[in-house]
Regions:
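N-terminal interaction/assembly modules
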Residues: 1-132, 136-165
Length: 165
């Protein structure tokens, strides 16, 4: 199973948990029972291959992070979706953005550009072109507003430390 497929499963799992109002970890336990996963494979080719341990860990970690940081992520979406309230954004688009934001903020093994690109590519399978562009814009603004200033501050601190030595 590729990371892209694992990411799409994580987005679907996060979406399902959020829609049901359930803890993502409990939803994942049900989702990844071999019997249930097999029934999903009958309906959607995305589920044809059961994830290996590495991909299963990635999916569980990402969905857990989305669940744990839901309030913060929703706030970030509204902040960078200027003029849009979360209620006006499709639930699928919001789920895609939450997962990408979690990868950017909390998963060091995923480069920011890769998280955005993967989110945009996955959105193309679910959303209209205008919404795909919207997702790209929100995530780009998010990185410029939240992540890059932190990286610049860290670089300045490192330079000051080197200068003092």
């Amino acid at each position: 199973m590729t990371r892209t497929v694992a990411r799409e499963i994580a987005i679907q799992l996060s979406f399902a948990a959020q829609l049901a109002g359930d803890d993502a970890r409990e939803t994942a336990d049900t989702f990844f029972s071999r019997e249930y996963f097999a029934t999903l494979a009958e309906e959607d080719p995305l589920f044809l291959e059961y994830p290996d341990e590495k991909q299963l860990d990635y999916i569980r970690r990402l969905t857990g992070l989305v669940y744990d940081h839901m309030y913060e992520l929703n706030h970030m979406i509204e902040k960078y979706a200027r003029g849009w309230r979360l209620e006006r954004i499709s639930r699928v688009a919001a789920a895609i953005m939450r997962c990408a934001m979690c990868e950017i903020l909390y998963m060091d093994d995923v480069p920011n550009a890769a998280a955005i690109n993967e989110a945009v590519e996955l959105a193309k399978g679910y959303e209209e072109p205008e919404t795909v562009a919207f997702i790209n814009g929100v995530l780009g603004s998010f990185v410029r507003g939240e992540v890059e200033p932190e990286a610049e501050a860290e670089e300045e601190t490192e330079e000051e430390t080197k200068t003092e030595e």
